Amino acid sequence: MHILTAGVDEAGRGPLVGSVFAAAVILPETFDLPGLTDSKKLSEKKRDALAEMIKNQAVAWHVAAAGPEEIASLNILHATMLAMKRAVDGLAVRPEKIFIDGNRIPEHLNIPAEAVVKGDSKIIEISAASVLAKTARDAEMYALAQRHPQYGFDKHKGYGTKQHLEALEKYGVLPEHRRDFAPVRNLLAQQALF
């Protein structure tokens, strides 16, 4: 008998702005999607196409997030674990086993779970979750770029690139910026001195 297995992965731990996203995906036993691998190894166009196919074919899937305020109050690791738990809790079908990318398991899942280092390249359910989390994170950055085009979020996706750091200095810190991340925190501290 097929065991209902969910894969869980996150996207957006490193950027200076926005939420950290997590996805949980249960795939059918017969699922086959050529080219599905760790989302970081895929082009954006390929990720977007795969995301639609995953959503259409999955037994269940759910994407969840933890916002900048939660990241600031909990720290990025605990906020990531919270987003992962929300993703699992949001599944319409309860899995019998969960595989989580990385080396940590969120608390209180109440389902047998296993952390798998580099799982997004080893386990297809985690690869699928990786794609859904990354496309959701990118969508947040495109929406933010619409509201604040001068920051270039559509290009750097919120990471601490030269363009982003220059925009931070020139235009200031947005409510969506992660105030506990060093480049943002340091800029706010400098501004407080003047």
UniProtKB/Swiss-Prot annotation:
Its cofactor is Mn(2+); Mg(2+). A divalent metal cation binds at residues 9-10, 101. Its EC number is 3.1.26.4. Pfam families: RNase_HII. Manganese or magnesium. Binds 1 divalent metal ion per monomer in the absence of substrate. May bind a second metal ion after substrate binding. It is found in: Cytoplasm. NCBIfam families: PRK00015.1-3, PRK00015.1-4. Endonuclease that specifically degrades the RNA of RNA-DNA hybrids. This is Ribonuclease HII. It comes from Neisseria meningitidis serogroup A / serotype 4A (strain DSM 15465 / Z2491).
